[in-house]
């Protein structure tokens, strides 16, 4: 079983990318579980066709300790298993703790047992790794491969670099490695070349360049992944290609994060900062 976490700046398209890629893996016959690690609880919406899933934390609050796996794990598109950790009420408590509680509960209830025959577990994790709870999938060895969703915008690259620092911090203890950067295009000038250069300097690969396409939004409005909503569309093939690349990926590295000056120089070199 491969344990993968998807990180990236808030709003970059992690949940969309994760669900569409998972749909591609499911189409290939892979058994996948998706664990949403975001208080918004939107990491499985497209796989479940818009069913607002009751989160692990909500279930615990309402049911107490008497929780069954079926209460928190729902089957979605292509036989994918979906769960959302959820979070505390706004303004109260720590969302990072929610992730820790949820993953521990899933383990206790046997979600990862061999009889489940899982090929993949995907953790879709909120934003930057600035809070210890959100770093938990990296820190405790729950995730072994990290893919960062990025774009050619400065803050997305800054966040990607920060996440690499988090990977370095826990590479020895948790055994986590960076599998690559997924460029989710925002149509910035020289975006592909810039992210390729960022990857080269960090010591990783741009595993896929995902073009910007309105079909993704159309599918989302219909509460589906692109592969589910319009399987013949070119964008569905892009997600299939990404799924195949992840499935075949052997390049797992400890990244070399850049200094801020190096990151800014990269932006200047490609004319973004002018």
Swiss-Prot record:
Cofactor note as given: Binds 1 [4Fe-4S] cluster per dimer.
A UniProt-annotated Pfam family: Fer4_NifH
PTMs per UniProt: The reversible ADP-ribosylation of Arg-97 inactivates the nitrogenase reductase and regulates nitrogenase activity.
Binding site for [4Fe-4S] cluster: 94, 131
Gene Ontology terms, MF aspect: 4 iron, 4 sulfur cluster binding; ATP binding; metal ion binding; nitrogenase activity
Catalytic activity: N2 + 8 reduced [2Fe-2S]-[ferredoxin] + 16 ATP + 16 H2O = H2 + 8 oxidized [2Fe-2S]-[ferredoxin] + 2 NH4(+) + 16 ADP + 16 phosphate + 6 H(+)
GO biological process terms on file: nitrogen fixation
Positions contributing to ATP binding: 8-15
CDD domains given in the database record: NifH (cd02040)
Cofactor(s) essential for the protein: [4Fe-4S] cluster
Classification via InterPro entries: NifH/chlL_CS, NifH/frxC, Nitrogenase_Fe_NifH, P-loop_NTPase
Enzyme Commission number: 1.18.6.1
Keywords: 4Fe-4S, ADP-ribosylation, ATP-binding, Iron, Iron-sulfur, Metal-binding, Nitrogen fixation, Nucleotide-binding, Oxidoreductase
Residues bearing the modification ADP-ribosylarginine: 97
Keyword Magnesium: no
SUPFAM superfamilies: P-loop containing nucleoside triphosphate hydrolases
Function of the protein: The key enzymatic reactions in nitrogen fixation are catalyzed by the nitrogenase complex, which has 2 components: the iron protein and the molybdenum-iron protein.
Assigned protein family: Belongs to the NifH/BchL/ChlL family.
Assembly mode: Homodimer.
Record protein name field: Nitrogenase iron protein
Source species of the chain: Solidesulfovibrio magneticus (strain ATCC 700980 / DSM 13731 / RS-1) (Desulfovibrio magneticus)
